[in-house]
Amino acid sequence: MKLLARALRLCEFGRQASSRRLVAGQGCVGPRRGCCAPVQVVGPRADLPPCGACITGRIMRPDDANVAGNVHGGTILKMIEEAGAIISTRHCNSQNGERCVAALARVERTDFLSPMCIGEVAHVSAEITYTSKHSVEVQVNVMSENILTGAKKLTNKATLWYVPLSLKNVDKVLEVPPVVYSRQEQEEEGRKRYEAQKLERMETKWRNGDIVQPVLNPEPNTVSYSQSSLIHLVGPSDCTLHGFVHGGVTMKLMDEVAGIVAARHCKTNIVTASVDAINFHDKIRKGCVITISGRMTFTSNKSMEIEVLVDADPVVDSSQKRYRAASAFFTYVSLSQEGRSLPVPQLVPETEDEKKRFEEGKGRYLQMKAKRQGHAEPQP
């Protein structure tokens, strides 16, 4: 108890210090990405730190833990989304005009570089790196700090895309205020990322049409054996002040379902290794019943790819039908009690659709493996 009390006092001191740094304009905690240097806000609020840099932080408590005792991956995703929502909403309201709130449209691939422990302080730093006419790109770094030793480490990197929705009509997308780039190449690189994610979002929306159906008495190691679903009634605590679900709430539920699928498949401790792009196809309003479904799509020797689909049912509005709200692929690894990675049982696809999804997952796995190896090669 004494250590916890001391940790809480230190955490409060750290929050106060972070606030002073933010006001003083000393920028973000953690390393920046070299290809995406911070840009400058244009408008009445240009006195903020570069790009309106947003820093949030809090101590990780026992209710943030997964069954293994580390911080739940969904909790980290939720903190990432909150930081992104703050900075993008702030920027989109930086000029005079119709007020808006930034809604999450997409999360690019997110890597879990290192586990975060209960009792550590999570520092989440966000900055805007590109804007188009109707969207904002935000890059987020997550650092963990051991407040007893002072040691810090980078645990997560993520890129998120937001769109500004009018407060008067949340179905209306507003224009994004411009930013000033430090160099022309930075804007060109951002435009390429924007066009790439836009194309992939369109392809994903058409591809993810089928619904996960339960199967009686499935065989072990098959897709049906581990597929899982959660049903959740969207309440006020899940929503923004404007009545639709926080993207972070949806991501945490998706991570929980993916974790259940992975645990059922390998019967060991599991941990989130990465999240492929999460696409938010439509808003989820308060009062909807959402079904979050997960199924195994591919296994390598030591990793599992799980597809997660979110369907929303507006039960209080008979004029609306059930619709696909979000979709993503999660990658999990199996761990021993000592925290070492273990081989996973190989998935046995049965139907033609399952075999097709397996080959598609294999392609994504090999593509990402080649990309990692390319980054690991020494520079000449």
Curated annotation (Swiss-Prot):
GO terms for biological process: acyl-CoA metabolic process; coenzyme A biosynthetic process; fatty acid catabolic process; long-chain fatty-acyl-CoA catabolic process; medium-chain fatty acid biosynthetic process; medium-chain fatty-acyl-CoA catabolic process; palmitic acid biosynthetic process. The modification N6-acetyllysine is found at residues 168, 198, 283. It catalyses: hexadecanoyl-CoA + H2O = hexadecanoate + CoA + H(+); octanoyl-CoA + H2O = octanoate + CoA + H(+); dodecanoyl-CoA + H2O = dodecanoate + CoA + H(+); (9Z)-octadecenoyl-CoA + H2O = (9Z)-octadecenoate + CoA + H(+). Keywords: Acetylation, Cytoplasm, Fatty acid metabolism, Hydrolase, Lipid metabolism, Mitochondrion, Repeat, Serine esterase. Pfam families: 4HBT (PF03061). The keyword Cytoplasm applies. Residues 353-363 have a biased composition (Basic and acidic residues). Its EC number is 3.1.2.2. One of its GO terms (molecular function) is long-chain fatty acyl-CoA hydrolase activity. The active site is at 66, 255. It comes from the Eukaryota. The keyword Phosphoprotein does not apply. SUPFAM superfamilies: Thioesterase/thiol ester dehydrase-isomerase. Residues 350-380 are annotated as: Disordered. Residues 50-168, 224-338 form the HotDog ACOT-type domain. Isoform 4 is expressed exclusively in brain. Pathway: Lipid metabolism; fatty acid metabolism. Both HotDog ACOT-type hydrolase domains are required for efficient activity. Catalyzes the hydrolysis of acyl-CoAs into free fatty acids and coenzyme A (CoASH), regulating their respective intracellular levels. Preferentially hydrolyzes palmitoyl-CoA, but has a broad specificity acting on other fatty acyl-CoAs with chain-lengths of C8-C18. May play an important physiological function in brain. Homohexamer. This is Cytosolic acyl coenzyme A thioester hydrolase. It comes from Homo sapiens (Human).
